[in-house]
Amino acid sequence: MKKIILLLLILAGFITKNYSQFKITGTISDSKTHQTLPNASIFIPELNIGVISDLNGNYTLENIPNGKYDVKFSYIGYFDLIKNLSEKNNILQLNISLNPKSPICLNQVVITAGTYSTQDETAIKIETINKKDIEGFGGISLIKDLSRIPGIDAVSKGNGIATPIIRGLSTSNILVLNNGVKMQNFQFSVNHPYLIDEFGVERIEVVKGPASLLFGSNAVGGALNMIKESPAPKSTIKTDVNMNYNSNTQGLVTNVGVKSTPGNYFFGLRAGIKSHKDYIDGNGKIVPNSRFNAKSFKIFTGFNAKNLVSKLFVDYNLMKLGLSVPPAFKLFSGNDRTNNYWYQDLSNILISTKNVLYLGKIRNELNINYQTNNRKLFETPDISEEFKTVDMLLNTWTYELKTSKPFGDHKMIFAFQGLNQNNKNSNAPEHVLPDFSIYDLAGMGLVQLNFMKKLHTQIGIRYDFRHINIKKQEHVHQDINKNFQNLSFSMGLTGILSHKVLIRSNIASGFRTPSIAELSQEGGHGARYELGNPNLAPQRNIEGDLSLHIHNTKTVLEFSGFYNYINKYIYLSPTDETSIHGLPVFKYLQDNAKLYGFETNFGFFPASWMNFSFAYNYLVAKKNNDSYLPLIPQNKLRGNISFSKSFDKKQLKDFSFEIESIYAFVKNNHHIAESNTPAYNIYNLSAVQTLAFNRQKIKISAKINNLFNTTYIDHISTLKGLGYYEIGRNINIGIKIILDKH
């Protein structure tokens, strides 16, 4: 591997001297008034390069390798415009007219489909959650906030612990990615949160349905991809300071980011802290030990040469996370920030490199990632190292070599991927998972065909091989050596029937190998005793999706239906047995399963400053015998009314106000070990005002979640049955200061 990397770098040095480039130049203006727009952004996501227009709206973007790219033009208060660029000349004159915003926006550049594409070019339905929406949630947990999106929910244990659910599937059945890198956090359990926060995230891309073609094992239900923020435009320094206070938990959040692009080199760094006391539910009761404290530090850097783009990212996250479990309730002595007992001490370091080399029209990408995740559990009030109960260290190397080549309006993509992973327990008394190692190898081919810009098809196939090695050790009575193989496919079609109507269909397969816990676990975990099964077979599924998008100047309608059939679905089932310590025994079993349903969205925009939207999702999840699967969320109806106004004042700028309603229907069709869950209805409010002072902007926000302090419990909350409910009224006050220096 080292020799290959060295050879590529030497080759890159030679090639960057011999391949030509071009530049684009032009003027950005308003499409109606024809006034020029200063400080507009011009950005090429694939190359990670960008500039801003000058006081007269003029711009020049240089050092662009010959090839095909999507260029994004954006300006506050206007629609983003995406231009497909394919040029071999030295200079391209490109004048752009931007349209003032209305609430309807169809197209964005996405990367989770395997390559940079606009949304209407992808045969896979990819939803995007932009930075404005992420900042506007106003919740305490990013993952829980995502449950406001139809088809996405979260299994939670308080505020700090939340695991996403996509169309009824969670934990080992979905993937969470940090800028395209699989997060590794012992995700077999809902008690193990992903160490990632909302700061430094440009947008979140959501794939609903099998994504094994792109990511391999575990992407049975879909994937969430947290896309990192873009570098600063050339010759600028951007700084943002974020401060938030949450009334319910007396939560304090501070995050500061700085980034700059002095030339062909760019860099950025970001640091933040979060501290929350135990939360108070709608009944006014303190939920013991739901507190958490977190720290984060992020760095990115890179450079653009003639035909080479190289980027390095380092993320370091720390979290001390209280566990709201019955043994902790007995030790509760008062609300506090400090983690004293029954808490997880978590750390995660992710180092990733992304390197792109252009050889004519051929794009070659080499990505290498290293991730280390340490999970410690302390149960007693003594926080010294001698009293830790669990101490596991998971080290993961992943690598990817990808090549894409356009031919006409079409594109071919080939990729080779691999993973080396090992887990090591220290001398802590409990080994939740044994020591193990995993090795993956995979090859993938994908063809994207575009006909007359009206019909887009995507066909792909992938082969995966996985080897799992678990040596005989405590709670593992024999060596477990397993080899798994799988062939995945995906076929999709997007038809643009008119500029107002888009239809998309897709059929895809997915798979996942049994997790280490499912193969080997034997011991207490939480409030139960879990028994693994070394003879479990891989899960395989196939899903069909059909979606429709219709819009005009005042309305938008979207519908997405799906049917997901899973062969040998793995689940944890209760038994009639009891362990020697009195814990109920649960065993991992397999059965065929089916999940089907739909999501629909309707928006009405009577004026440019007013927006009404409604969304409903429906889901059924059963085994073949028609009994229900566990941890399936309630069907929900969401309503939203928003008002926005842009002021052409010297200091007073954008203002927005939003009212949101979430209604969860009663849940009486559930797994045999679960109980009925009543319906609930909660309301949220938010208001944001932007002020401007020269090159400084200040955003002041006030958000109220659970406005009427409703007492409720969600069906998939792990606190259900313990006498505690979801968080009560929470008022979030935030200030964001943005400083630009040219």
Predicted regions and their residues:
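Structural motif
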Residues: 26-37
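Bacterial Sec-dependent N-terminal signal peptides
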Residues: 1-25, 42, 69, 106, ...
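Outer-membrane beta-barrel proteins, especially TonB-dependent receptors
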Residues: 102, 112-137, 144, 155-169, ...
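Short, acidic, small-residue-rich periplasmic hinge/interaction motif at the N-terminus
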Residues: 29, 40-45, 74-78, 88-135, ...
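Short, flexible loop/turn segments at beta-strand junctions in immunoglobulin-like
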Residues: 61-63
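Short, acidic Ser/Thr/Gly-rich low-complexity loop/linker segments typical of extracellular
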Residues: 47-58
